[in-house]
Amino acid sequence: MIRTLIVDDDPFVRMSLQTILEAQDDVEVCALGADGDEAVELFERERPDVLLMDIQMPGSDGLGAAERILGAHKHARIVFLTTFSDDEYIVRALRLGAKGYLIKQEVATIAPALRTVMAGQSVLGGEVLD
């Protein structure tokens, strides 16, 4: 099972992602969070295989949380799922050590992306590669 932590400020997105991922035989959502501070706290407590997280959230954002998590756990697998395909965000996320960067509109790619990251590879959503 791929234990996955989902962090997004939108409760509808969190619940939708949970529903989509838990329909997979090999994915378990271990916790849900709403901001970067919760991402750090839940990562420490749950030790997920993959953290699926939005970049822009009120308060503590995803990039700041990723920096804190990767500072303490350099092998953490973080995949950003966002509406932003901005070069600045992509470059910053990858420099921090994120294993993936997906666009929210590409929902069908999420579960395969988690499997790819678990296999030791990195993933980038289609829009990001344009």
Residue ranges of each PLM-predicted region?
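Active-site beta3 strand of CheY-like receiver
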Residues: 46-52
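Acidic catalytic/metal-coordinating carboxylates
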Residues: 35-38, 61-64
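Short, flexible helix-to-coil linker/hinge segments that flank and couple to helix-turn-helix
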Residues: 88-95, 105-130
